[in-house]
């Protein structure tokens, strides 16, 4: 949440331009290394209730099919660094399962995707609860777009288990067409004169993804 969010402003440290230490909804500083804006304390019962009420409203008011949660690795109060933030965290699993249960209570067939990228045991625990996990296959598709066979294996997209949701590009992993133009493997992909060839190669990528 940003500083304009009312619950952030209720308890605000103006001199530091961030949430105050007595703010029950937010951490002063995120305990994990991936924070954007102000970090919710998902262990707090008020925050938990607030999130659940919002999920319920969105499902009922807009009849959403489900949700994709960004940075669910950060749904924790456990202090971590980049070296251990992905380690198994039972408290984070409990929080996410609680939100998932609240969603299913409103809409049994809701589809929920997590951008998680954590320990395999943790992801398997979440998958066993019916949650789906984001899987990054951007590098392989970029290699293919540029014309390189090395590291262009798409098998990460196709798992026997339905829990993983692979993606070719996202809001974080993008610029495939730029890489194709900047570092092509073949002359037939170089320059403005070969735009049609590059677009055909990208179309093949899309066909494999779909």
PLM features per residue range, with description:
Residues 34-38, 81-94, 179-199:
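Non-catalytic scaffold segments within catalytic domains of secreted glycoside hydrolases
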Residues 100, 149-210:
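Active-site-proximal substrate-binding groove within the catalytic cores of carbohydrate-active enzymes
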Residues 22-23, 37-39, 123, 164-165, ...:
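Generic secondary-structure boundary/loop-capping signal
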């Amino acid at each position: 949440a940003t500083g304009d969010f009312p619950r952030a402003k209720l308890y605000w440290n103006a001199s530091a331009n961030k949430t105050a230490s007595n703010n029950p909804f937010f951490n002063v500083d995120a305990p994990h290394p991936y924070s954007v804006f102000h970090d919710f304390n998902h262990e707090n019962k008020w925050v938990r209730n607030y999130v659940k009420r919002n999920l319920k409203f969105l499902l009922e008011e807009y009849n959403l099919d489900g949700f994709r949660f960004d940075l669910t690795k950060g749904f924790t109060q456990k202090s971590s660094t980049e070296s251990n933030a992905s380690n198994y965290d039972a408290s984070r699993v409990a929080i996410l399962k609680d939100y998932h249960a609240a969603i299913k209570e409103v809409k049994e067939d809701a589809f929920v995707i997590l951008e998680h990228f954590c320990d395999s045991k943790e992801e398997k625990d979440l998958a066993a609860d019916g949650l789906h996990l984001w899987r990054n296959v951007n590098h392989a598709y970029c290699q293919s777009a540029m014309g390189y066979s090395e590291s262009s294996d798409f098998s990460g997209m196709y798992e026997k288990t339905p829990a993983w949701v692979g993606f070719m590009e996202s809001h974080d992993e993008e610029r495939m067409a730029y890489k194709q133009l900047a570092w092509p493997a073949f002359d037939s992909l170089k320059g403005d004169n070969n735009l049609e060839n590059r677009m055909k190669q990208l179309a093949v990528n899309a066909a494999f993804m779909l």
